[in-house]
């Protein structure tokens, strides 16, 4: 049933091979699995770990502009996106997210959570056309994860 969800004990979390929530040293947390959507909500620590992992991976690439916002009141890490970049152009840079439930590692490819957006921030219906030589793209690629 696509409207069902389950609460499970989240024991660990990794982005690629980087341990963000260590099951050996940290207490488990409640995790919810929703089989009806692609929305993933993770603890703030895990969200920040993924975003910092992405930032570390692309920081030396001058063709990629990865931007994260901060929440005005709490200064917590907010939405992150690739500016002036199509999702198809960055999916090869993404590592998978790995969740540990019941001592089993489950892997999700993060490109399932990348959404192309237009310059006004609206999700586009289909992937943008390839960018030709000398052309620029004024949209972006949003990471659809939430803390």
Positions of predicted regions on the chain:
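C-terminal catalytic lobe of pepsin-like aspartyl proteases
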Residues: 1-147
């Amino acid at each position: 049933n696509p409207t069902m969800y389950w609460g499970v004990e989240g024991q660990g979390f990794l982005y690629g091979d980087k341990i963000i929530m260590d099951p050996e040293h940290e207490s488990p947390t409640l995790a919810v699995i929703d089989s009806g959507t692609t929305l993933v909500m993770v603890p703030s620590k895990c969200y920040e770990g993924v975003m910092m992992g992405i930032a570390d991976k692309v920081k030396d690439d001058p063709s990629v502009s990865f931007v994260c916002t901060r929440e005005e009141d709490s200064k917590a890490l907010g939405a992150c996106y690739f500016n002036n970049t199509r999702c198809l152009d960055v999916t090869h840079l993404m590592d998978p997210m790995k969740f540990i439930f019941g001592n089993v590692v489950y892997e999700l490819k993060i490109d399932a959570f990348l959404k192309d957006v237009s310059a006004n921030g609206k999700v586009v219906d289909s992937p943008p056309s390839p960018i030709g030589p000398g052309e620029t793209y004024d949209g972006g690629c949003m990471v659809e994860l939430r803390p």
